């Protein structure tokens, strides 16, 4: 099997090489070995980055290491001294630019490939002109040959220069001219006497190493000329950074939220499908528009929410398209909270997977609070009813400014108790402007709202998933249990098949791994997740949330993190955490540090209340 895969990957590369276009990005065809081809190209890019880094190091060393008198004498006999000095300065710029291009090469940017090809050849010329170094020049010519042979490994698009980015360039030129003219005026007696126009020309040409810099009569004047060259080098670096910004592809925009939710409702088979349509997420259209995948891109990692959602039979094509799209944009493809079926299918593509949590799903056909396994649930419900808690749906026709204000008050207090802003990604937020996309239930005491929940549909309207779960700090014990139970009973009476209470990260890590399910998973990663589950209560109360949802006697469905075999798991874990944070990342982290150790008043029995902290998958 491995030989057939390798042969398929080689055939794919050979077909790509035979394409006539030379500098245009090569399209990666949709195929079963899409991930295999991506991994092969990634390994080749790593070798390219190593080779480029060696040349960049040689460039910097060749530019800054002092030359001996004998070396200078040889240079003076063969080259004008000004040309030699200019070559050394350009060599430094070339080395710095190559280092800047290294990250773009690793991501597969075509622009980075073109730039590296040019700069390595230029480095060879500059090593000859600046230092007459035949060894370094020969070394610099090796990477461009290798880059040319693996040109099909660079298919990613960098973001086109925007108007805002282009406007930065005149500011740099203007600042350079202003700085140069003011400095020349201050040092007029120590610099050559030139006209105003000649000064402008000399400043620009000197800054970008297009001519020999004018000499100065004093050390201060010579330092001023060197500062112009540093300014020019910095400008080139900024321009290179602007050219290599990653693409941010929003193929489905926030304005499409309503249509996106309806599509995910129709074709979604798991609760995560509904969360993929939350307004802050972007979406990729895969399999010729037949499949939708909600995602967020953070630092070059595209994190898909759950499974790709679409018509049956499109799973293979959708996964191949996801890999291809990510490679074209320089992203690492990842699926967060994918189902067991998707994880199995992805492993056949060459992905790795590890169980990271479980989803609590309640079968509604025979749901009731009767029986021993839901005895604790009955007790909490009776207690809440004795305290006067009344539960009802809150529909668009019933909306009032008073109730809306009370919902906002509860949500604001909940945020204050957890010392942070609203999170996002797979966590919903209270947005009354999109009220009709949710089904909302409220709990009242004496006509005042003390808690509420929101639900999102999936399975073509035959199932719902719990999104927001928020309560007032003085809500009676058992309020949340009663609120959820009455919602579930209503869903059952309306003929719905199931209701997801959402996922619990880390909930499965203390259970044995099913035979063959995660043969490739890193045991050290599972050990780390298990430790976090056992000791991470200060950060995320997974155990409390698991105990709370267990009272509903759900069935537990595993959720997986699916990632390429060669991916950096530490980087993926970091980007997943950042995906949940809004723009105020610093404020969120500061809030976690300042979190009050005293928990809010319980809404249930002290040993089984839902945690007050938000969690990936459920805002409780």
Feature map (PLM): residue ranges:
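Topology signature of small-to-medium multi-pass alpha-helical membrane proteins
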Residues: 2-253, 616
């Amino acid at each position: 099997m491995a030989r057939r895969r390798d042969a398929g990957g080689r055939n794919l590369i050979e077909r790509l090489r035979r394409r006539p276009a030379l500098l245009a990005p090569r399209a990666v065809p949709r195929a079963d070995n899409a991930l295999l081809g991506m991994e092969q190209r990634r390994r080749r890019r790593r070798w390219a980055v190593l080779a480029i880094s060696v040349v960049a190091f040689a460039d910097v060393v060749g530019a800054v290491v002092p030359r001996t008198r004998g070396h200078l004498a040889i240079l003076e006999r063969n080259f004008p001294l000004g040309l030699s000095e200019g070559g050394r300065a350009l060599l430094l710029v070339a080395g710095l630019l190559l280092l800047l291009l290294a990250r773009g090469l690793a991501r597969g940017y075509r622009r980075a490939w073109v730039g590296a090809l040019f700069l390595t050849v230029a480095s060879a010329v500059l090593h000859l002109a600046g230092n007459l170094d035949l060894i370094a020049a020969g070394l610099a010519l090796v990477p461009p040959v290798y880059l040319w042979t693996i040109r099909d490994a660079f298919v990613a698009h960098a973001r086109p220069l925007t108007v805002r980015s282009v406007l930065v360039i005149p500011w740099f030129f203007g600042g350079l001219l202003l700085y140069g003219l003011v400095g020349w005026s201050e040092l007029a007696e120590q610099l050559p006497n030139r006209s105003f126009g000649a000064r402008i020309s000399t400043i620009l040409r000197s800054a970008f190493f297009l001519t020999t810099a004018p000499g100065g009569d004093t050390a201060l004047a010579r330092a001023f000329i060197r500062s112009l060259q540093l300014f020019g080098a910095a400008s080139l670096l900024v321009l290179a950074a602007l050219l290599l910004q990653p693409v941010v592809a929003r193929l489905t925009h926030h304005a499409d939220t309503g249509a996106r939710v309806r599509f995910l409702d129709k074709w979604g088979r798991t609760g995560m499908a509904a969360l993929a349509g939350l307004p802050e997420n972007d979406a990729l259209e895969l399999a010729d528009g037949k499949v939708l995948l909600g995602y967020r891109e953070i630092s070059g990692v595209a994190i898909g929410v759950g499974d790709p959602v679409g018509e049956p039979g499109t799973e293979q094509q959708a996964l191949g398209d996801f890999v291809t799209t990510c490679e074209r944009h320089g992203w690492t493809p990842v699926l967060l909270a994918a189902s067991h079926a998707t994880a199995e299918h992805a492993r056949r593509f060459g992905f790795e997977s590890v169980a990271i949590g479980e989803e609590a799903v309640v079968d509604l056909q025979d749901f009731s609070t009767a029986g021993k396994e839901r005895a604790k649930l009955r007790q909490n419900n009776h207690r809440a009813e004795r305290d006067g808690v009344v539960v009802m749906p809150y529909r668009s026709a019933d909306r009032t400014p008073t109730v809306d204000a009370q919902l906002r008050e509860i949500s604001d207090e909940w945020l204050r108790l957890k010392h942070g802003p609203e999170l996002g990604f797979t966590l919903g937020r209270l947005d009354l402007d999109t009220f009709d996309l949710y089904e909302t239930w409220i709990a009242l005491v004496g006509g005042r709202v003390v808690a509420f929940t929101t639900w999102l549909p999936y399975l073509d309207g035959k199932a719902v998933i719990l999104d927001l779960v928020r309560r007032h700090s003085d809500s009676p014990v058992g309020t949340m249990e009663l609120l959820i139970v009455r919602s579930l009973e209503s869903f059952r009476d309306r003929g719905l098949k199931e209701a997801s209470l959402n996922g619990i990260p880390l909930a499965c890590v203390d259970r044995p791994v099913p035979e063959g399910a995660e043969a490739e998973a890193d045991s050290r990663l599972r050990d780390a997740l298990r430790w976090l589950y056992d000791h991470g209560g200060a950060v995320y109360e997974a155990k409390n949330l698991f105990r709370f949802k267990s009272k509903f006697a759900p069935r537990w469905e595993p959720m997986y993190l699916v990632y390429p075999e060669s991916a950096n798991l530490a980087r993926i874990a970091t980007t997943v955490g950042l995906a949940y944070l809004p723009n105020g990342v610093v404020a969120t982290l500061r809030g976690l540090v300042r979190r009050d150790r005293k928990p809010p008043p319980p809404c249930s029995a002290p040993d089984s209340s839902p945690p007050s902290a938000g969690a990936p998958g459920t805002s409780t």
